[in-house]
Amino acid sequence: MGTSEHVPLPTDEAKAKELEQSQHSEEPDRGQWTGKFDFLMSMVAYAVGLGNVWRFPYLCYKNGGGSFLVVYMIFFCLAAVPIFLMEVTVGQYLQKGAMEMWLMCPLFRGVGIGNVVIAFMCIAYFCVIVAWAMFYMISSIAWVFPWETCNNYWNDATCVTGKENFTELARIKALVASAGGHTQTSVEQFWEKRVLHDTGDISEFGGIQWELFFIMAAAWLIVYFALWKGITQARKFVYFCALFPYVLIFILLIRGLTLEGAGTGIYFYLKPNATRLLDTAVWKDAGTQVFYSYGVGFGALIALGSHNKFNHNCFKDAITMCFINGCTSITAGFAVFSILGYMSHVAQKDISEIVKPGVGLAFLAYPEVASNLPMKQVFAVLFFLMITILGLDSQVCMMEGLFTALEDAFPILRKYKKQSLGIFCLFFFCIGIPMVTHSGSHWLTLFDAYGASGYALLFVVFFEVVGLAYGFGAHNIRKALHEMIGVTLPKGIEYVWKFCAPATSLVLFVFCVVYYHPVKYPDGKDFPFWANAFGWFLSSCSMVVIPGYAIYYLFFTNKHLTLKERVRKGLNLDGSFESPAKKNLVNNAEELKFIESSSQ
């Protein structure tokens, strides 16, 4: 009889490790934040962006200064904070992206698709803005800025620098007027003729601006390598992109406040105008700015929250993030308007003649003021570096939100992450190519105005809030927060989620439709009819999927059920849902308890 070989029994530690591995094999590895501040920093990197630095200060001035701030704070309390907290909480609790989380309320799954479409629209053009900023940053490394003079090959006879004496300027204007034209500053000609090679017509592509093409390619490579191991592994990139812009903002703020005329700019920034509170345009601009700057409705917050551990204090992070976002906008306002006050002082013009809306504020106003600053090269490089970083970090987080939603819906993408991510980055790069043609800025304006903000965003956010508040259940969101971190919110938050937040987004959507104005060229002319029609098509892409999927669900699925039963199941009226993370925690506790008892 042969001797049998002794096989040692596995230790408790080995069993626990085996248990953990088996559970990970059942659920695909989504990746989790490992550091205490990873989630907070990722939200800062995502939500704090170009809208805070330039769009907020401009809108604040345009709409009455202090009056705009009052309205902004109202929307901040009624919509931004509640919806922000709602998205983060549900993402963490369900451990799903924007599409798959709606399996708990399938009638609203079209909302998740709408989130993905809006993110798709925004991702398509964000790297183009980054390319513009990088182009300016590179151009700033010169003793004389290329936009300072009219002696460049792209300048024509209508060019003025603003530094001519009165007699010379009058002569140039008279000469140009006699030819039926108008003068352009050297800054404007650099932007239109050198950076964009602008044809002035969205219909005339005119070829590719190859410098922007290659810079955009470099930007997409940065995005790819920041994400190829998953955003939870890109800690250094996230932290750098979240924190470094604040260094630059405070440098610009300190420098701006020490400039002559800064007080004039601050006064215009904060000047109260109570009569503007009755102006519907103020409410529309403040509301849309709140939704856009806090990044709700894109699915990215849900995705970032889904990478949290089940018991992570997402409530504290969400409230902190909302406070940081608001303070960043206000601080950036002081920095920007102190500099604009200096411009007003130097040019002896009213600020209303200096400030220009949209991308023009960043790429026309600042190059002009940088030319008159001491150590101009340093401040120009710092400013456009800040724009570049803010664009890249928002792009990375939006891409993560989109890719997480698609990975949850199609798990094979997670298995081949590097390859599939590369294909997606290449796809979006190709979509961006028309936006680096000679009419590219107009295509970007179209995507921004119709596809990624305004009507489409507000429409999707309305149904998202309704679906979460009534499908998932406002009381269940409050309960989920308590289960995860032990925080019990006041009962009143349920009424905010069920009534205030949906009403706010719906009213803003109606405002946008009622006060609709076709998109215009910078010179005030309307885009052609076909372009605005295409814009409405872009908007409809994210809107029609919501009722479209609901119709599909009610009439083409679960045919063995009655229509009433399908509605009941689609709205999850039975409240049957469970957090995968919570289930894993329970299973862990039960099986480890069994291991301990069996080993004794």
Curated annotation (Swiss-Prot):
Tissue expression summary: Highly expressed in the head, the excretory canal, tail hypodermal cells, epidermis and vulval epithelial cells. Expressed in the excretory canal-associated neuron and in some non-amphidial sensory neurons in the head (at protein level).
Compartment list: Cell membrane
Coiled-coil regions, chain positions: none
Residue ranges, compositional bias (Basic and acidic residues): 12-30
InterPro entries: Na/ntran_symport, SNS_sf
Function recorded in the entry: Betaine transporter dependent on Na(+) and Cl(-) ions that functions primarily in the epidermis to clear betaine from the extracellular space. Elicits current in response to betaine but not in response to GABA, L-carnitine, sarcosine, glycine or dimethylglycine.
Protein name: Sodium- and chloride-dependent betaine transporter
Organism the protein comes from: Caenorhabditis elegans
Name of the gene this protein is made from: snf-3
